[in-house]
């Protein structure tokens, strides 16, 4: 402090990564116009709310260093400006979360980061199953993208390796895969398979259920057709109560409670017009409800006796997320006729899978 510096003087050397405390080697060059009588180290960073004050005391050194403005990282746009741009070009039907809108600029593993550097533990965005920007996923994507981008009309080992590893995690009867681009496409295909296999059209669903945003899936999603802007339940959709052992009419996490809720499914399929009973193995949008024991098993038995099939929607709950099992339906020791997976199986990238029996396929 207080020493004069001439153009061309050496002011610093950059050491190796290890000498820099594990940080990327860099030069922290800061102009201070007023030390404010501070004896200790002058602040080198500041919270976003204090940025303008500290910038007035430590103006940008780019002119002194001869750095062109084009090399300076621009200040992030104001959230309100981004919101106005979004409102001009993106449908208002697509909502933005939270009263104080978040400008998220990147994600790393379990964290999201906003434009001001705040980190958020991501407990909402459920599609990056093994974390945002997971290095192993990025590496695998890069490897495949530089090798081949194609579809299923040609032979290629990768899709075969993937399907074989996937069905190895499932019950033996579930052995045929269909690959699509999303959970919505997967559920739509599952419905088509069920209707083709049974020759019937109707569907039994749980109250509060959500299975996708295509026209056919809105029609089997009470969360959508009973929600804001919904058109109500189609005649071919039959809604049964959520198997909620805490708030519902039957209490307790017992097999008796599960059997009691399954009787609603039995009544719904009794008329013989149903092609399928579709349910999330652990309903997500409906409230993160863990069904009581024996519910899915008993419901599947009733469904099959009526000539229909059981579709397990594992988009939100499958692939290890139950904790003690790999698939949600395994919690009740039941084998579905069709299993549906969505974007989480691609860590948020456009991928969905339908796995079913050879007879249905």
Which residues does each predicted region cover?
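Acidic, glycine-rich catalytic/binding loops that coordinate metals and/or anionic ligands
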Residues: 3-6, 16-19, 23-73
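Residue-level marker of beta-strand positions
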Residues: 4, 9-10, 119, 344
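Conserved "cap/hinge" positions at secondary-structure junctions
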Residues: 9-15, 359
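A short pocket-lining beta-strand/turn micro-motif at the edge of beta-sheets
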Residues: 10, 23-27, 273-275
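Short beta-turn/strand-loop junction motif enriched in small, turn-promoting residues
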Residues: 14-19, 223-225
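Conserved N-terminal phosphate-binding loop of PLP-dependent enzymes in the Aspartate aminotransferase
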Residues: 73-361
């Amino acid at each position: 402090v207080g020493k004069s510096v001439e153009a061309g003087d050496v002011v610093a050397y950059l050491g190796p990564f290890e000498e820099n405390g594990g940080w990327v080697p860099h030069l922290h060059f800061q102009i201070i116009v007023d030390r404010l009588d501070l004896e200790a180290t002058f602040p080198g960073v500041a919270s976003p709310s204090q940025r303008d004050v500290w910038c007035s005391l430590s103006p940008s050194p780019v002119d002194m260093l001869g750095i062109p403005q084009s090399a300076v990282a621009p200040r992030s746009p104001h959230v309100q400006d981004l919101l106005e741009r979004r409102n001009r070009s993106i449908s208002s039907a697509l909502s933005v979360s939270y009263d104080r809108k978040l400008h998220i600029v990147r994600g790393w593993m379990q964290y999201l980061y906003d434009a001001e550097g705040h980190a958020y533990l991501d407990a909402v965005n459920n599609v990056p199953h093994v974390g945002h920007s997971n290095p192993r996923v990025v590496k695998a994507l890069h490897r495949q993208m530089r090798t081949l981008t194609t579809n299923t009309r040609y032979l290629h080992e990768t899709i075969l390796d993937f399907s074989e590893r996937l069905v190895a995690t499932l019950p033996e009867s579930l052995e045929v895969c269909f690959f699509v681009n999303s959970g919505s496409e997967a559920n739509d295909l599952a419905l088509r398979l069920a209707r083709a296999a049974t020759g019937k059209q109707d569907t039994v669903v749980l109250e509060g259920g959500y299975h996708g945003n295509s026209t056919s899936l809105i029609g089997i999603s009470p969360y959508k057709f009973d929600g804001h802007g919904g058109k109500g339940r189609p005649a071919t959709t039959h809604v049964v109560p959520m198997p909620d052992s805490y708030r519902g009419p039957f209490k307790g996490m017992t097999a008796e409670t599960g059997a009691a809720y399954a009787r609603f499914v039995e009544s719904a399929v009794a008329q013989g017009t149903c092609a399928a009973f579709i349910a999330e193995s652990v309903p997500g949008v409906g409230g993160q409800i863990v069904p009581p024991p024996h519910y899915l098993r008993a419901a599947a038995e009733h469904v099959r006796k009526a000539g229909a099939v059981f579709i397990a929607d594992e988009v939100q709950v499958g692939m290890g997320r139950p904790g003690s099992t790999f698939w949600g339906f395994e919690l009740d020791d039941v084998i579905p006729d069709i299993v549906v997976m969505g974007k989480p199986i691609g860590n948020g990238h456009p991928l969905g899978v339908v796995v079913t029996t050879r007879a249905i396929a």
